[in-house]
Curated annotation (Swiss-Prot):
Binding site for Zn(2+) 2: 1285, 1288, 1310, 1318
Lineage, highest ranks first: Eukaryota, Viridiplantae, Streptophyta, Embryophyta, Tracheophyta
Zn finger (ZZ-type) start-end: 1265-1328
InterPro entries: CBP_P300_HAT, Histone_AcTrfase_Rtt109/CBP, TAZ_dom_sf, Znf_FYVE_PHD, Znf_RING/FYVE/PHD, Znf_TAZ, Znf_ZZ, Znf_ZZ_sf
TAZ-type zinc-finger residues: 607-687
Example of a GO MF term: histone acetyltransferase activity
Function: Acetyltransferase enzyme. Acetylates histones, giving a specific tag for transcriptional activation.
GO cellular component: a single term: histone acetyltransferase complex
Annotated positions binding Zn(2+) 1: 1270, 1273, 1294, 1297
Positions with a binding annotation for acetyl-CoA: 1071-1073, 1090-1091, 1146
SMART domains: KAT11 (SM01250), ZnF_TAZ (SM00551)
Protein name: Probable histone acetyltransferase HAC-like 2
Chief location bin: nucleus
PHD-type zinc finger segments: 827-933
Length: 1439
């Protein structure tokens, strides 16, 4: 026998260690210790990991459940230890355990809870089997039992964890488990222990001494209630003997409510005499409000205050075990009796206490499906049943019996049965038990209340306060713009008053209702038929309506109308959801939604929940008032105008403790909403969700839309028992058991328009999302609709998304439309809740409905569009990648695309939709929600990446391969350096992945020399044009599954075939980047990793061109003007534009790395190299030596200077002074002129003026020498030898200059003006290519032909990079055009019809484009000139 199963019989000691837990379901037979305090592992590192895991679990519990912060630390610690033990048992491997510790722990916490609860339930079933085979007629008292004066033994999670043997040789039994944990709630308060453990703990059975048999429990009342069915095989005898007593008294409310309606088999009486134990009647049962001395159970044992029905040994051994009470001494019951709390204990059990009369609830509101705790009969006898059972069976007519039979059929459909604390269940026939209990249930509910005399004012006050409590709870979430007309009942006020006074309230055994808010309804209307339409928080189950004759009793139509069912409703919903959720209690409870998340009987948590609801409701009201567009006084919310004034006040109020009404409170809740980072915040969670839905649907609302029935959605939610959130609770639809079953995966049906005529249209108000609709009126001559699980929702179509959903706690959800029950009311009591939401988790598809005889033939309408693979890049994604992509999106205005499945609309940018692949608008598009659904159902798989070509599919070149090879090598080295610094492995260090470098454009071009400049230098054989190759290089990185362009640069390559002065030179024309590089970390040196990557790209480029024989590179470090873009259109707002100093330093730091690698041999600037003569330079300063590049600054400036000089010579420009006044002597000497006042050449004057402009910004004009240049002739040496001076740095001369040096006299040789001579050593020049021919193919692309062309292309199509969302889409479209170069790149839009105009079909499009490019270039030059003038002025001020 397993130790966990038979310990309580063997007498062995269990759970003696303080941290040990009894695991009845474990097969090892040992109590497993939770953490290292139990059996110690041999690995100290593992012990440390387990301690860390426990601490993290404690933190998770405290952070997700604020209520636990007020509880003792030990209780939370023990709970975490138990969860840790489950996690460790599942993951004993150290590596797996470590990954869980450092990863997302919430799923594992859910699994631990589920495992723990499963073990608990298995242990309960084992104990149940043992107790069902044993008799407890005689018990052995436990001397050390502590009697609780409050009548309740309450604990958070564990109880009775005693140690040491008892004095009589018996041992304690330890069982620790939650009994009242909630799902979708905020409470982790739990009842101490179930009744059976309490019985075993305090009363030891004595075999062979029993003379009584335990009654079996009703199978339908077994799910966590602990009640025994009072209708057993002895019910007929009891009914026969109760008639004489029934004539003497009117009723016994508590007895009938507990024993008759709830089917518990427990009966109690209210006695006038005082308790024999001297207990005050006012404090009976922990303040339940039962103002009588004692409550008796079936065996007629008087219940003292300490325990309602314990063995009397612990208090007074001399007291009799049983005491029968004279029925004639009973008093007339009051409504307070009816409002008795459910905190009744079984023998030795701990009760789920209530704290005040506000928490009192009649047990008759309990459904058969769930109860939090219950009563168990101790030693019941047939005689006691026969003498003390009072039921009146008269008054139930034929029609009611028919309704009861229908009710019985529906009850049998519930799949809510889950044994929890059912301890005596094997003595009676199940069939008779079900029939009798159900019959007795309705009789006691329907007749007892009608026969009771509610003659106490206290009862009405109690009910009023109870009503007020529920009204406040409901009104905290109901929108204020719900019209009072929707809340009107169908009955007169006098009828309500009479029914309220007499207690004639009829409800089904499954129904739980919430009255209308007291601040929205008059008191006389708070209990009519319309009141149950506001059941927005608790699930409600509606049974079949009664027969038409019930109209004489209008309150029977009100299926859910008990004012006394508040607390029971909370507990019912919590327990129901605890079993319906896929996840177990506690974990699901952290998401607090759906039901009032309070501990059963906890007034404190109830008040907190009310406060949470009020704050969230007020927050939504503030948003509504802020965005409400209705004229003043016309908003359906009567308080909108006042809150608008408050919002206006809040925008300008700066006073901390402002006295303006509601100002301070509004600031607090709004500030909390802005700063809250808790994902499970009770206030912000639902407010954010509703606001998100409202913002997405604000522009889509259109009332004229058909209604859909989405069956798959309801199948999923009904089968899994997953209920909605607190503001999204659906209502019940009728179920018909006599219809044929629905298909396994039913299709969809479109409801006819007449079925939705009475459904109101949702308001265009983003602040309030819920509205209630009237029940739909159905014709009697409609055909029956087969029983199908369906969801009622408005079609999700553009421009609004509105859902009308019906949902309940029945296992089968029937169709609510076009349905009539023969002989029943022609009204379906279905409360249609209308929501304005984006979409359900399951998508909706529009289909046609074909009505046939007795069934619905549903066919899916095909789209008829061709399936073009790769129309959306998301087709390549997995659902995880789709979620990752969607989570990174932000709201933005853009073009839209409609899903062909659910017809919802999405941004093309968010959907990564390629409109170019949908030219004829015939391509089928599937949104991500439908895509995920099809993926889950196995109807779709991610397409291979080859369907949509990406950056890797672009043509590779020698240059791109060289840069990539170097980049990846350097990234591996850098990653290893970080790993060494952190003393960890390489795999544990994040690295840059998914990088691709490609040359997207490589075309031959010619640069024409400007006419004025060419005219001046024409005599020097200056070339009229320079051939060069223009290249565009891009860097891509895959971010969240999408390739994003992060970096781009344009370069000009002037090869060996080009004439002097541009021969073998490279010009870095433009460089641009966006700040989306991942990961955003730093290198070991403290440099950003993204900067490191960009530098390596530039160094790799310089290295490649040095190997090809290029000699120098020219860089103009010129940052763009604010708002100007070089290559990529629209940069992120977080990316700052660097200043000139920062940008220059950025380039210089890159070049210093290149110098260390001997790629760059020397750095200088344009001014020092060409405008100033070096010490031993033997060449004169001339404009003909300046490298002439396309788009560079000085060629344009030189043309303007020459034009100005010509105007001065012609006398057309007023001279403001002589041009030679500021020229330096050094410059005159270098130019070879001694007098510029007269006939100075235009070239010399040009160099003078140009030098004046360039000198202040000379540091920004960087000259990079890839090869050594001669110090005498300034030419780059690419062949032969270079002569090096070991004593002088940076002195190199070529062979030609060395030969000329040798012909000079010694005093004129190097170094000049020095008496000692330096010896020069020759160095052979190797590794320089004789020609610079590019062996890469020509890559032509219209959009990347020039920088301005690509920028104009992006501007025209709004391919922006200001957000990652847009950067993904822009890169996708860029790659599409790169892979399809023959397609039209520049398409204009007609100003008349807004259609695209292809090339050749528009009017003067090319000339317009040229003018735009010229205008843009002129504007750029103007801005550059202005920036240069500002820089010159700045340098002048410093000097």
């Amino acid at each position: 026998m397993k130790q966990g199963q038979g310990a309580h019989l063997s007498g062995q000691r269990i759970g003696h260690h303080p941290t040990a837990q009894m695991n009845p379901g474990d097969g090892d037979g040992n109590g497993r210790h939770q953490v290292a305090s139990g059996h110690a592992s041999a690995d100290p590192e593992l012990m440390n990991l387990r301690i860390r895991m426990t601490n993290r679990l404690i933190w998770e519990l405290l952070s997700r459940e604020p209520k636990l912060q007020t509880r003792p630390r030990k209780l939370v610690s023990d709970l975490a230890k138990r969860f840790e033990a489950v996690i460790y048992k599942k993951n004993p491997n150290k590596a797996a355990y470590y990954s869980i510790l450092n990863g997302e722990i919430f799923p594992h916490l859910q699994h631990a809870l589920s495992t723990h609860m499963a073990q608990h339930q298995q242990g309960q079933q084992m104990l149940q089997q043992l107790t069902s085979s044993s008799s407890y007629g005689t018990t052995i008292p436990i001397p050390d039992v502590v009697q609780n004066a409050s009548g309740n033994t309450r604990a958070l999670y564990e109880m009775d964890n005693t140690s040491g043997p008892m004095s009589n040789g018996h041992h304690h039994f330890s069982a620790n488990f939650p009994l009242h944990s909630t799902t979708k709630g905020a409470s982790l308060e739990m009842s101490a222990v179930s009744m059976q453990e309490g019985k075993i703990t305090h009363m030891i059975p004595t075999p062979g001494s029993s003379n009584q048999q335990s009654l079996p429990g009703n199978f339908h009342y077994s799910t966590g209630t602990g009640y025994l069915n009072g209708k057993s095989n002895v019910m007929a005898q009891m009914q026969e003997q109760q008639a004489p007593f029934a004539s003497k008294i009117n009723c016994c409310p508590v007895q009938r409510d507990l024993g008759g309606y709830a089917g518990s088999g427990v009966h109690s009486d209210i006695l006038n005499n005082s308790s024999p134990y001297g207990v005050s009647e006012a404090h009976m049962i922990d303040g339940m409000g039962l103002h009588r001395s004692n409550v008796q159970v079936i065996n007629r044992t008087v219940v003292p205050e300490t325990f309602i029905n314990p063995s009397p040994y612990g208090i007074s051994p001399n007291k009799p075990l049983q005491r029968h009470v004279n029925p004639s001494t009973r008093s007339t019951p009051t409504p307070a009796d009816i409002a008795a709390s459910t905190s009744f204990n079984g023998t030795g059990s701990s009760a789920l206490s209530t704290t005040s009369y506000l928490d009192m609830t009649t047990v008759n509101s309990l459904p058969k499906s769930r109860m939090d705790s219950g009563l168990i009969m101790s030693q019941p006898t047939i005689q006691s049943f026969q003498t003390e059972y009072y039921i009146q069976t008269e008054g139930l007519d034929l029609q009611e019996k028919i309704s009861l039979e229908q009710l019985h059929q529906q009850v049998n459909q519930l799949h809510l049965i889950q044994p929890h604390s059912q301890y005596a269940q094997n003595q009676c026939s199940l069939k008779l038990q079900q029939q009798n209990s159900l019959h007795h249930l309705v009789m006691s509910r329907g007749n007892v209340l009608t026969q009771c005399h509610l003659g106490s004012d206290h009862a009405e006050k109690l009910l009023d306060k109870r009503n007020q409590l529920h009204s406040e709870l409901v009104s905290s979430q109901i929108n204020e713009h719900v019209g009072l007309t929707n809340l009107q009942g169908h009955y007169e006020q006098t009828q309500y008053h009479d029914n309220y006074k007499k207690g004639q309230m009829s409800a089904s055994s499954q129904n739980l209702g919430i009255p209308a808010p007291h601040d929205l309804l008059p008191p006389q209307q708070q209990f009519d038929d319309g009141s149950y339409r506001l059941s927005c928080f608790l699930k409600e189950t509606y049974t079949k309506p009664l027969q038409p004759h019930c109209k004489s009793k209008p309150m029977k139509e009100v299926i859910m109308t008990s004012l006394l069912s508040g607390k029971i409703q909370d507990g019912f919903c919590q327990k129901k959801m605890a079993r319906d959720r896929e996840h177990h209690p506690i974990i699901s409870g952290w998401h607090s939604a759906g039901c009032a998340a309070t501990s059963f009987g906890s007034e404190e948590v109830m008040e907190n929940t009310k406060q949470y609801h009020a704050q969230a409701r007020w927050l939504l009201f503030l948003f509504h008032a802020k965005s409400c567009t209705s004229p003043p006084g016309s908003c359906k919310s009567s308080y909108c105008d006042r809150v608008r004034e408050l919002v206006v006040h809040l925008t300008d109020c700066q006073i901390k403790d402002c006295s303006y009404r509601h100002c301070r409170e509004s600031k607090m809740v709004s500030d909390h909403y802005k700063n809250c980072i808790n994902e499970h915040c009770h206030v912000c969670c639902k407010a954010k969700e509703m606001l998100r839905r409202s913002s997405e649907l604000a522009h889509k609302q259109n009332p004229a839309e058909p209604i859909l029935i989405t069956q798959h959605n309801m199948n999923q939610r009904s089968a899994d028992r997953v209920h909605g959130d607190r503001m999204d609770i659906d209502q019940a639809v009728e179920t018909f058991d006599d219809q044929p079953p629905a298909a396994k995966r039913p299709k969809l049906q479109l409801v006819s328009p007449d079925a939705s005529e009475n459904v109101p249209v949702c308001q265009k108000n983003p602040g309030f999302m819920l509205q209630e609709a009237h029940p739909r009126q159905l014709d009697q001559n409609k055909k029956m609709v087969p029983d199908q699980e369906v969801d009622v929702g408005l079609d999700i179509r553009h421009p609004q998304v509105t859902l009308v959903s019906c949902h309940g706690s029945d296992e089968k959800i029937g169709a609510a439309q076009n349905t009539v029950i023969p002989g029943a009311l022609n009204k379906i009591h279905c409360h249609v809740q209308q929501e304005t939401v984006v979409a359900d988790k399951e998508s909706v598809t529009v289909v046609d409905v074909k009505k046939k005889t007795g069934s619905v033939d549903v066919t899916i309408s095909k789209t008829g569009k061709p399936k073009v693979k790769g129309v959306s890049l998301m087709e390549l994604f997995t659902p995880e990648q789709i979620h990752e992509h969607i989570n990174s999106l932000r709201q933005w205005i853009g073009q839209w695309v409609q899903c062909d499945k659910c017809e919802c609309w999405q941004h093309q940018i968010c959907a990564l939709f390629n409109a170019r692949r949908n030219d004829v608008e015939e391509a089928e598009y599937t949104c991500f929600k439908c895509y995920i659904e099809e993926f889950k159902r196995g109807l779709r798989m991610p397409l291979p990446e080859s369907v949509v070509r990406g950056a890797k599919d672009l043509p590779r070149t020698l240059l791109s391969d060289h840069i990539e090879e170097r980049l990846f090598k350097r990234l591996r080295e850098e990653r290893q350096e970080r790993a060494n610094k952190l003393k960890t492995s390489l795999d544990e260090v994040p690295g840059a992945d998914g990088l691709v470098v490609r040359v997207v454009s490589s075309v031959d071009k010619k640069l024409e020399v400007k006419p004025h400049f060419f005219k001046i230098l024409q005599e020097d054989n200056y070339p009229a044009e320079f051939p060069y190759k223009s290249k565009a290089i891009l860097l891509f990185q895959k971010i969240e599954g999408v390739e994003v362009c992060l970096f781009g640069m344009y370069v000009q390559e002037y090869g060996a075939e080009c004439k002097f002065p541009n021969q073998r030179r490279v010009y870095l024309s433009y460089l641009d980047s966006v700040k989306y590089f991942r990961p955003d970390i730093e290198t070991v040196s403290g440099q950003a990793l993204r900067t490191y990557v960009y530098h390596e790209i530039l160094i790799g480029y310089l290295e490649y061109y040095k190997q090809r024989g290029f000699t120098s590179c020219y860089i103009w470090a010129c940052p763009p003007v604010k708002g100007e873009d070089y290559i990529l259109y629209c940069h992120p707002e977080i990316q700052k534009t660097p200043k000139s100093d920062k940008l220059r330093q950025w380039y210089l730091s890159m070049l210093q790395k290149a110098i260390k690698e001997n790629i760059v041999v020397e750095l200088t600037n344009l001014y020092d190299q060409f405008f100033v003569t070096a010490k031993e330079c033997k060449i004169k300063v001339s404009a003909a030596r300046l490298p002439y590049f396309d788009g560079d600054y000085w060629p344009g400036a030189a043309e303007d200077i020459i034009n100005q000089l010509q105007l001065e010579g012609d006398g057309k420009l007023l001279k403001k002074g002589r041009v030679n006044k500021i020229i330096t002597k050094r410059a005159l000497k270098a130019a070879g002129h001694t007098d510029l006042s007269g006939n100075a050449s235009k070239e010399a004057m040009l160099m003078q003026k140009l030098g004046e402009i360039i000198c202040p910004i000379k540091d920004d004009l960087i000259m990079v020498h890839l090869q050594y240049s001669c110090s005498h002739c300034c030419t780059f040496m690419v062949s032969g030898r270079r002569w090096v001076c070991n004593e002088c740095k940076s002195f190199y001369i070529c062979d030609r200059c060395y030969n000329a040096e040798q012909r000079l006299e010694e005093k004129e040789r190097h170094p000049s003006n020095s008496k000692c001579l330096h010896i020069l050593h020759p160095v052979e020049i190797v590794g320089v290519s004789e020609d610079t021919k590019d062996r890469d193919i020509i890559l032509e692309n219209e959009i990347f032909d020039t920088r301005q062309a690509f920028l104009s292309f992006c501007q025209g199509y709004h391919y922006q990079y200001d957000t990652l969302r847009r950067a993904k889409h822009s890169t996708m479209m860029m790659l599409y055009h790169l892979h399809n170069p023959t397609g039209p790149a520049f398409v204009a839009t007609c100003n008349v019809c807004n259609c695209d105009i292809e090339n050749g079909q528009g009017w003067d499009f090319k000339s317009f484009e040229r003018k735009q490019n010229q205008l843009s270039e002129s504007r750029r030059m103007a801005s550059v000139n202005e920036r240069v003038r500002q820089r010159v002025a700045e340098v002048t001020r410093h000097e």
